[in-house]
Amino acid sequence: MKKFFALVLALVMALSLVACGDKKDDSGDVTAEHTDTTTVAVGAVILARDDVSSDDVYKFVADIFDNAASLTTSHAKYGELSLEYGASITSVPYPPGAAKYFAEKGFEVASVKDGAGNTDSRNLRFVTGGESGTYYAFGSVIAQHATNNAGIDVVGLVGNGSQSNVQELQDGNAELAFCQSDVMAYAYNGTNIFADHGKVDCFSTVAALYMEQVQIVTTNASIKTVADLAGKSVSIGAPGSGV
């Protein structure tokens, strides 16, 4: 199962294209044609700078997973968390504090970052996402609960997407960050969108939280495959957002 998760995190499997026909009901609204589709799926992960103390990381991860079942009413994403998936990242090592927590729960991580976490406790700035997005809403709940219950001070910050969040870690403007798993790997290895910038390896993986699916929706009935998008305009997210 861990190999499966690793493959899903490392590779963009396929693109989900939901084709909506140009049929209209009596009200004039467009109605969708429902078909099974495959989906682009990457993991939503939390990263920590290597100078965040092991004790703080341990408390932070424990607060997320130990309280997930009781906090689904605070945010639905808590219901998607699992310890197995949380410990499944193979492309970037975990900090000792996170590795310790998952080991206590019976899950060994693939690798542990040597030298990470050898610092004192401090306030933690957690850069998330745009104010209207899931990263910000979920991250704010995580930060507030950890501050109120875990004995650490975490503040959620608005972010500008995965690539920007990694940059915030490198620049020392945040200690924790939401990121997509593919962007995380690009940064750590200095590939793809980080090829010109160079690798950023001042962080470790705190935990993988849930899978993110990306879908393309169209009202043009002639667009049924990815190839049909040739020459078409597609509305995407902000540069560096991962979408």
Which residues make up each language-model segment?
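C-terminal motif of bacterial Sec signal peptides marking the signal peptidase cleavage site
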Residues: S16-A19
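Pocket-lining segment of extracytoplasmic ligand-binding domains
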Residues: D25-V52, S181-V183, T191-I193, S222
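An extracytoplasmic/periplasmic, membrane-proximal ligand-sensing/linker region
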Residues: D25-S27, A41, D55-L124
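Bacterial signal peptide processing site
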Residues: G21-K23
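Pocket-flanking alpha-helical
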Residues: G139-Q144, N148, V155-H197, I216-T219, ...
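Bilobed "Venus flytrap"/periplasmic-binding protein-like clamshell domains
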Residues: E84-Y101, S121-N149, V154, E212-V243
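Hinge/capping helix and adjacent helix->loop/strand transition within the periplasmic-binding protein
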Residues: G43, L47-S70, A146, H197-D201, ...
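A structural signal for short loop-to-beta-strand junctions that line the ligand-binding cleft
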Residues: D29-T38, A195-E212
